[in-house]
Amino acid sequence: MLLRQRKATLIKVALTVMFSTISIQNSYAFEMGINTHLRWYPEEQDHYLELINNYGFNSFRDDYLWALIEQQKGVYQTISKINRVDTSFLISKENYGMNPIAVLAYGNDLYDKGGYASNDEAIAAYANYAYWTAKRFKGKVKYYEIWNEWMSGTGTHNKSPTPPPVQIYFKLIQQASIAIKRANPDAIVIAGSFNPLVSYGQKWSNDLIKLGMLNYIDGISIHPYSFKSTDKSLNTPDGNIEKIDEYQAELKRLAGKEVPIYITEIGVPTSTGKFGYSEDYVAQYIVKYTLLAKSRGYIKGVWWYDLSDDGDNSKNIEHRFGLLNKNESKKPAMESYGKIADLIKNYTIKNYNVTSDGKVNLIFSNGKREARVTWKRNYNQEGGNSTMNKIMPLMTSDNQSPQKITALVIEDAAQKNPPSVSADTPIITFSNQ
């Protein structure tokens, strides 16, 4: 059923416009989000929005597909295939207090045969679609992400694409950002969605910055997946975040100031084959990673990939990224995140330091209560499921006895007999200030 139909008025984009109002800002609240595939799910949108809200997330991220919005040149309308996503963006802020990300995703057969928007007509058309979308969701959607994983060819018809030159993506950012800000000056525009942990990702980012990308966007989105890395340290939350710290240092060097970063996708699969990890390991990973990200002022949010498993094949990586099982029962990851959700949403970071022997110390406060978090860095921690990435017993630093992976331990300051766990287990102690 057609919900809305509107003839487009072409947006004439003047590339000489001054961008004094589109600047990097540093005051956004930390968002805790989850990626969704609302078009694929069996229930109506409120079922999932309520789940997300109840589990302690204040944002979700989903695709708003250009090809489903503009199916006749110059005509923008929603159709049944995207109703659930469209309605979610329209109601999630008012009904659930959420700040969603709308991903302005992928190509359109009307212009570039479903590949990259790489010619002038396609880029202008993409900007028109971005304008229509931002106007439709003004006051309802806070974040707009320009494309998704341009470097990887995600969403294109060609499964092994060669991305167009960096200048093409820059031009797309330039025109789409102008269009979005014209429709809604308060919109937060982000772009990138690449992996900064690999050298070619950083080079691509640096090239975009040198072209002037930061004059058009409010922050850079990244997807720092590392579960396939041969560098064991990058497979740990500490090593992953430290690499992002290095990337931020490079951004400061190029931009002369701190640049907001949005981790719009990150996840670890619980598949049983190669590159899959145990559910307990993933639960601890999510706890540590979220706390570490929260401690960085330049990281403005984390959106975990994803809400629920996408398929039934336990050996398929893409089927096992969910924090929930496909039947919506909770994995340990969701159970563990629920235990820190209030801390993430309502506490602010007061102190972060690492001792010379690798002990991580974080202090959070909500003005009345204080939360102290500690664990010992372990860059060699194992959590793989497959025979090629075999799970190894964890050892305590004292007696080297095998230890089960524990996601986290929550203590009261008055507790006299804390449980015995591995030194790399995060321990959270709450006390009154």
Which residue stretches match the model-derived regions?
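Bacterial N-terminal signal peptides that target proteins for export
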Residues: 2-14
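Bacterial N-terminal signal peptides
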Residues: 12-22
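Hydrophobic faces of well-ordered beta-strands that scaffold small-molecule active sites
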Residues: 32-36, 60-62, 98-104, 142-146, ...
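Aromatic- and carboxylate-lined catalytic core of secreted/periplasmic carbohydrate-active enzymes
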Residues: 288-382
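C-terminal beta-sandwich/jelly-roll accessory domains of carbohydrate-active enzymes
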Residues: 350-355, 366-433
